[in-house]
């Protein structure tokens, strides 16, 4: 298992990469780091499977970054929707 920390905007994600069920496949588990100084992890976890070469660090990094980008985009979208809904409720 390999562990990487990737930053996107003002968020940090801890990614654990483990061998998948098939050759050349890896499971990437992403945990958002809420307080980087204390390494407190958000309990919400995204399991993600990506075909990457586990022997090549650049391939692992590229695969993990694409998983984080996808997850980060979803979280950012959710946050925007929550903010818009809150503003709408305050106006009505």
Please state what every model-predicted region is:
Residues 1-35:
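Amphipathic, interaction-prone secondary-structure segments
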Residues 37-92:
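Mixed-charge, Lys/Arg-enriched low-complexity segments
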């Amino acid at each position: 298992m390999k562990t990487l920390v990737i930053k996107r905007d003002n968020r940090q994600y801890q990614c654990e990469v483990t061998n998948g069920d098939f050759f050349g496949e890896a499971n990437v588990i992403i945990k958002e780091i809420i307080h980087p100084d204390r390494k407190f992890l958000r309990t919400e976890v995204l399991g993600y499977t990506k075909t990457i070469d586990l022997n090549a660090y650049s391939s692992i990094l590229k695969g993990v970054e694409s998983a984080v980008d996808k997850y980060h985009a979803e979280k950012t979208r959710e946050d925007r929707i929550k903010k818009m809904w809150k503003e709408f409720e305050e106006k009505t």
